[in-house]
Every structure is written in structure tokens, then in C-alpha cells.
Design a protein with these regions (language model features):
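A short, N-terminal "cap"/entry segment at the start of jelly-roll beta-barrel domains
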Residues: 1-58, 134-139
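Short, conserved beta-strand element in jelly-roll/cupin
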Residues: 53-56, 68-85, 124-127
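Short histidine-centered beta-strand/loop micro-motifs
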Residues: 28, 62-70, 87, 94, ...
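A short hydrophobic beta-strand segment most commonly corresponding to one strand
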Residues: 49-52, 102-103, 116-133
Length: 139
């Protein structure tokens, strides 16, 4: 009889190590103001989960624009710096600094209003690949 742990291990993930190598950060179309380092989680989980280390390329030059993500789970952990968000339906901005963890509800429209030039975050999503959809201007 196969244990539940063995079945889960075989079905869900593989060992992957993503070393912090020079040149590991790449720019993506999604946010040209940031560069991303793929942490190998998508490959290890067959695309079920994605994890990226994101960092700002420079200072914020203005709000990023209202948008939402077509995914089931979205977590952002602030490693360094500060970011200011605005969510649809909220009457105040949320300022998150190093050590803060944000779990965004699926389909929730939001806007990144400002961030520091040294901003670095860990982003975890389910699934790894998802669409980002522009939302109507909610300001």
C-alpha cells in the first residue's frame, strides 16, 4: 500500500534548486519596470504553482494602471523596500514594507500606485501561468 505522503510527493512536485546566478533576472512583458528571477517552482510542480523573485529596475514613474489577474491564488511577500497598492472598493491605499505579506483575492482589481527603487518581492501564484487583464480606471 502506498502512503499518502508518497502519492502526494510523486504527484505534486520534484526537487529543483534555483541558484542566484548572475544574469538570472530577466525582464518580462507584464511589468517592464521590474525584472524577474524564476525560482523553478513552476517546473517542479508541473505549472500548478509559480514563484518569482521580482525587483524594481528603478524608481516608480507613476501608477502602473488598474488590472486584475486570472488566477486562483496570489501572494506577495515584501523582501526589501516599500510598495503602495490601491484595491477596488477600498477607500484607502495600502502601504506594504519589508516583511509584509499580502494575499490578493482572485479577480480583485488593483493598482500599484508607488514603490521604492529598491523594492524586491517574492510572488507566489496558482497557477504559474496566468493572464493579467487591464481593468477600467477606478480612480
Amino acid at each position: 500500500m502506498t502512503s499518502d505522503v508518497t502519492r502526494l510527493k510523486d504527484a505534486f512536485s520534484q526537487l529543483r534548486i534555483a541558484a542566484a546566478e548572475p544574469g538570472a533576472f530577466k525582464r518580462r512583458e507584464l511589468w517592464s519596470a521590474f525584472e524577474y528571477r524564476d525560482l523553478g517552482v513552476a517546473a517542479a510542480t508541473g505549472g500548478r504553482i509559480g514563484a518569482f523573485h521580482m525587483r524594481a529596475i528603478g524608481p516608480c514613474t507613476g501608477a502602473q494602471g488598474w488590472h486584475w489577474h486570472a488566477l486562483g491564488f496570489h501572494m506577495v511577500y515584501i523582501l526589501k523596500g516599500r510598495v503602495t497598492y490601491r484595491w477596488e472598493g477600498s477607500d484607502r491605499d495600502v502601504v506594504a514594507e519589508a516583511g509584509a505579506c499580502l494575499v490578493q483575492p482572485p479577480g480583485g482589481a488593483h493598482n500599484v500606485i508607488d514603490y521604492t527603487a529598491d523594492l524586491e518581492v517574492l510572488e507566489i501564484t496558482m497557477p504559474a501561468d496566468y493572464a493579467t487583464i487591464p481593468a477600467a480606471d477606478l480612480d
